[in-house]
From Swiss-Prot:
Organism in which the protein naturally occurs: Brucella suis (strain ATCC 23445 / NCTC 10510)
Listed GO MF terms: copper ion binding
A single Gene Ontology CC term: plasma membrane
Protein topology in the membrane: Single-pass type II membrane protein
Family under the similarity heading: Belongs to the COX11/CtaG family.
Name used for this protein in its record: Cytochrome c oxidase assembly protein CtaG
Pfam families (UniProt xref): CtaG_Cox11 (PF04442)
Amino acid sequence: MTDQGENEKKQRRSNATIAVACLSFFVCMIGAAYASVPLYRIFCQVTGYGGTTQRVEQYSDTILDKTIKVRFDANIANGLPWDFKPMQREVTVRIGETTMIKYEAHNLFGEETYGRASFNVAPGRAGAYFNKVECFCFTDNTLKPGEDLELPVVFFVDPEFVNDPDLKDVKTITLSYTFFPIDKPKPVVNAKAVGSTRNGG
């Protein structure tokens, strides 16, 4: 009986060890999954991988004679009652030339709604050379009931585009946006105003 009891205790300890190991592995996998999203986003922004465009603060100093066609695509995710489309379907621009185009959005719902745009470029490798100076995708967007909103994008294609051997046959780039519904943005608290109110009270 004693040997049997010891064996049962060892078995329970072994089972408990396995359970703890499995739980730890599961928790680590969840943590890795959550961490991989922002890390992947940062990687894409730095390298242009997956068609992620680049955000820049200044215009190109060089404009080439070579031109490229840029097409514009618009999509709406489920749950966002907007009509969203480019105001022009395509433009032909000189590489390095700064260009502004506009999308437009219309709220079809009877209440205020909120959207956030994701974006990518095709072919994916071209994303490393597609630079946006201004874009509605940099911030969240709010539309009142029935409101129409023009959404500008200011961009240029980096002149280094022509030096990439993998893109030598590319004549057209497609810039695509998808709007997703989001919760109502939280109001920004004015710390100075709050402090003044407290001091005055």
